Amino acid sequence: MTDSYEVGTVSADGRFDVARPALDLLVWDAPNIDMTLATVIGARPTAASRPRFDAIAAWFVDGAEDPTAPEPPDVEACVFANVPPQHVTSLQRWVEALRSFGYAVFARPKLQPDDDIDQSMLDHISMRAHSNRLRRLVVFSGDGRNFAEPLEDLARAGTEVVVVAFSEVAGYAISSELLQFIDIEDVPGAFAAPLDRVRLDALPADGAWLRPTKSLRDAANLFAARRSA
C-alpha cells in the first residue's frame, strides 16, 4: 500500500510530535456499496438508492464538534476502492466527486476476483492510531470477518468506534458490547428518499410484509439445477 498522505503535526526531525493531535477518522469500504445495497433492497441500485457522500461528510464533521474541547479535532474521511480495469472510465467521475466532497480516495487496481481492500483500510487505521490520538473512528462496512477484532481492540484502548452499515449485514457490530452501531439510513440526508426495505429493528407495531427478493419459480429452478449438477 502506498504511504498515506500526512495529517497532524510533525516535529523537526521527521517524527510525529509527542503531543499527538486528536483525530476523528472515517473509513469507507467502497467495494461493498452496490453489492450490499442490492442485497438489502432486492434490486439493482440506482442513483436515488445510493448514499449521498456529501451529506455523510457533513454528518461526520458535525459529530466532531465538541464545545467542551479547547480546540476541535482534525477530521479525515477516506474511501477505499478497488478499480477493475474495465471500469476505470466510469469510476473516474465518481472518484473526482468524492475528492470534491473532502474525501481522500485510496484506489487500487482489482486484478483478481478475490482482491480485497480490507487490509489497506486496517493499515491506514493503524497508522493514524499511531500518528494521532484517534478520538473517534467511523467505519462504513458491514464486513465483520476482518474488522471485528481490530475495531474492538481500538475501543478497549479508548477510541470511540462507530460502525455504520445496514443492520441486515452488520450483526458483528450490533452484537458487540464495545462497538457503537448506526444504521446508515439513520444518518440524516444519507439517501434522497427512503429505501425500499423493512428493518427488523424498526418494525411497525402492526407488523410488515417482507417481499421476496427472487421469484418463487426462479428459486425453485435454481435449487433443481444445483441438485442435478
What do these predicted regions represent?
Residues T2-D115:
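Domain-level signal for Mg2+-assisted phosphodiester chemistry and nucleotide/NA-binding surfaces
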Residues T89-S228:
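Nuclease catalytic cores that cleave nucleic-acid phosphodiester bonds
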